[in-house]
């Protein structure tokens, strides 16, 4: 089960139905989730919290339910909390520029400092990573794939990642949205900014062979006439 795609597995002959296990509506095991993010079994309080074990990445993550909404918590791995500061700062910047994105805020949960964002998937709108989408689309060139299935937001992502010095836009860190009819709806809102402000001028781009992030951003602006976006 996952809150990011609609697929689930049950034993053959099982009488369980999806509504019996629907994570959007069912409560979670609080202790399991707290262990996932704190690494400790010495839990003094129970909250409606779940471990997030389906996302890629080394940061400890878990899900909480607050006032009917579901939030993803990601624990900081930096003593100075620069990873949280980066996510919150980029989130505010993208908000000012009206770029679809996950909104991050700083939070503290069970004495663990975290970034916190409300999940953007629903029972009817799901995400698939670019990495997984390659097999589905039959498109081996990820730049062409991004332009084909989510052009506007994909091109903005490349420019914004250069401007914010985000060095972690690997192909499991951006995604496409698809609905409950398996129809692709475009690029998902941008997410995962904890490695922003870490870039260098000569860093090689993940979207352009031997080109740098700067060169690919310039190519996008000039080729697709994105000057108005700036």
Question: Which residues are covered by each model-predicted region?
Answer:
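Phosphate/dinucleotide-binding and metal-coordinating scaffold of catalytic cores
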Residues: 1-166, 175-230
